[in-house]
């Protein structure tokens, strides 16, 4: 090996200002072994420390689930918590009475979209927004609702506000659990565009 | 690799990978963030700085304060304090459960604690233990909460109640987060050092308020002028070697005032989703009104 | 398959080298001037750290303006400019082709210097952008980009017109650096300064730009120099081209991700990805160093004792910087060294120790060949080397150890901050000031050396122009220059 790396002396001695050449000796196998081991280590490291490449996972928390789980007040009454969120996020458009505004924002009180057996469609509307014509209680509406998935970032909060909507102003539908909210968020949270009424009606009301 | 085109294609692919990894992906994730409603504050967070503070940020940038000061609080861990909020009806079994949760308590101590609910029954537990204790109390009729407490040298040093996250800097342009701590961290300095005069003196000459400081002086932010009849109300109370000559006073220029406004606007004093902690009523003096409204 | 270049005898180089004379001397002399200015700014900043009232009354020389001014002067004024000069020379030599359109190169170089000057003055005037490595205000950046299109364009055309089609490993590195720089520079300028992205995305893109600049652009120029000059001086061939290829691809793909330590205000995936890539970069560096070690193993004296010293300093610093970055990226270590003097220490090793020493070696070795004049005082060059080496190592070691102590103090919440700064890091800062003084002296000697060479090369011409010809020695010198090798 070392004999090969010594300079090949051509007929004359290498001149002072000679341009270097290079050999293409066979690469030692150990290089590939180490490279593969490093790649394996790298994958493992990213698995444990990268927080699932999630934008909400910082510092000592390992995953989105952990962050969502440790939120203070997670044990509170969800309806009360939902009321707080409704007041801050939804009330400006849908009003404190849940009646909305004619021609602009559909009502939530007594709405056939809200009083379904499961919260699947409502969760998706809150997460991604809604655009285009829809029929609520027989009336036609054509409005745009912005996506709120980022504004209501935690699944517990999302479940709370949906539970509140489904149990106030005379609505008597089921509570939405944080697990259901998490499941729907996982499926459609990154959708990036609003739903249309037709797309939603094609989906089941129960969360899968 | 003797072909120029092969090399070029390879370099192009590497550029694409690099771009996607650290330019496109962060832009998709972080660049599209918007303000968020924070329940504890009852409003959107963060709110934009006032006009004078924005100009102060410009002074901060131009003077290069970010070369010595960071605005980033780090967090290295978290633990929980278990709080008994409501003992419920079955106090005897709850007392026993409290003793199980905190084995260092005698029966008398546990009884006292239960009587004084809401009260902390155990401090500083890790997540597994916190989950275990919550499960203990699940069907007992008592209400127990696990309150998260962030840990870290920055937090214990009093630089802030939680780590800083991307949401805190949404309105900052340019970001002046800094990466050297030759001076203390400033992310929460507006909550920590609230005295305007202290800041002005510190900027004029740090030795007036901090002996032995290595921070340079910034006298060019101030004006040394003749006392015109009555001393100006803005004049700095300088003494000893820092006092100006007889009959002169030092007043801050608009740059100094706006810089201090900016520093006083630097606050990290509410939890956010990514960095939770228990927010107590006392921390939000300005938002007390919205807090009482929620009680309805 | 052995790929030995044909051994051209020295007299054949003269026409190739000569085509490049004026632009090289121009680039090199401007570069060393910027190094001097940068080290003066750095020295002022360092003095301010223990003498806060030093030059306090002027807003143009605050600590916060001197530090970015020094960094930008050294990166854009010295390192990139000397880097362009070095890579053009290597491209011509390895491709055995004359420089294409040297006149445009001169225009490009002038524009570059004007851009850097405007940028530095802008930083001092308070218009810094606040972005690390890109503090020059927005109005200076287009000038730099325009200058680069000329310089980079000429380099690429020269590369394309090469006579020897086989590529030596250094040429891959040069090619990659030439493409990488305008890409990251324009992207960073647009996304950070032109139309800034929102929030902490700026931190990630800034880190991406800084890593790309350090590891890929400047790092590749430095590596190209090491792989070209060390075998050249040792009169050997590079041990294994495949090892170079491996290192090339690893550094190219992963290099721009390295260097963002975990613990900043960013989601954890950014720091974690950066850590993994820093380790890959360190591994690639080990492979490179091994390759060079095998190249010179068992060899005799090198054809230039001082040149090889610069190159060994460069290699050792580059390897140390890569290994230390990987070590510091681990979460437990990053907790200690993040936000401390450790990071400027790494920067000194990388920028001054590795890239700087490599470029100084290049200047030392190729300016005489290009200009046709020898250095007038080898003793001054020895002094330059020793003051530079000792100065850089003093600063780097002071910052690295001081940074560790700094970090340990920061992680101890019971230790008051003033104690950390006063007792902990003050002695290290004093040590670094001494080091920076030595580097400034080295830069001064360097400027003296290069100016002497410049004068001796062109004094005949200049004096002819001014009608002062016919003064014995001078015209005699210019006569002998034309015939010399």
Q: Which residues fall in each region the model found?
A:
Chain C
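Hydrophobic alpha-helical transmembrane segments of multi-pass integral membrane proteins
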Residues: 1-485
